[in-house]
Amino acid sequence: MMKPHNLFQFLAVCSLTVAVASAQAGAVDALKQFNNDADGISGSFTQTVQSKKKTQTAHGTFKILRPGLFKWEYTLPYRQTIVGDGQTVWLYDVDLAQVTKSSQDQAIGGSPAAILSNKTALESSYTLKEDGSSNGIDYVRATPKRNNAGYQYIRIGFKGGNLAAMQLKDSFGNQTSISFGGLNTNPQLSRGAFKFTPPKGVDVLSN
């Protein structure tokens, strides 16, 4: 399992790129267009984290409402919920009966994930280019312009005009891959869906 801080940043970056990327054709122009048009998205995901020592796979669902709101719920092999409500990022580990909360600005404000709340920052924060095809999936590579972003690049893949996959390679060479399913690019979401109240009896820690 990722450490909470890394998980916060990764999921926030994912929230950005999913919201930006899941429109139609897998072209850079589609990314730019959807960045201007998209406000919300929901669906399911399978996440695989590959390091030199081991591979970890997890499954769950997600929802995003721009600006700045996201919720990722892991269901297998562990139960964990990560909610960004615009001010606080909450990580609830069901099995540990523990909640960790962090300032959203501190948790993700120093990363390109901050452009969740700024639709104009896509091109200023990333260099975008077509990145070939594999297994019928067309990829766009988004390389952060900041040297200290914490990851090397994000690859966003489309199949049949729909978002199919995303890959993120960090500065240590570890790769996180996500495949998406059941996408709804026009979900009926309210800000209330991203409010989180720690359940009674759990330990609440602050970062």
Swiss-Prot record:
Location of the protein in the cell: Periplasm
Gene Ontology biological process terms, A to Z: lipoprotein localization to outer membrane; lipoprotein transport
Entry GO terms, CC: periplasmic space
SUPFAM superfamilies from the UniProt entry: Prokaryotic lipoproteins and lipoprotein localization factors
Similarity section: Belongs to the LolA family.
Subunit and interaction comment: Monomer.
Protein name, entry field: Outer-membrane lipoprotein carrier protein
UniProt signal peptide: 1-23
HAMAP family assigned to the protein according to its UniProt record, in alphabetical order: LolA
Species the sequence originates in: Neisseria gonorrhoeae (strain ATCC 700825 / FA 1090)
UniProt keyword annotation of Signal present: yes
Keywords per UniProt: Chaperone, Periplasm, Protein transport, Signal, Transport
Principal location: periplasm
Disulfide bonding pattern of the chain: none
Biological function: Participates in the translocation of lipoproteins from the inner membrane to the outer membrane. Only forms a complex with a lipoprotein if the residue after the N-terminal Cys is not an aspartate (The Asp acts as a targeting signal to indicate that the lipoprotein should stay in the inner membrane).
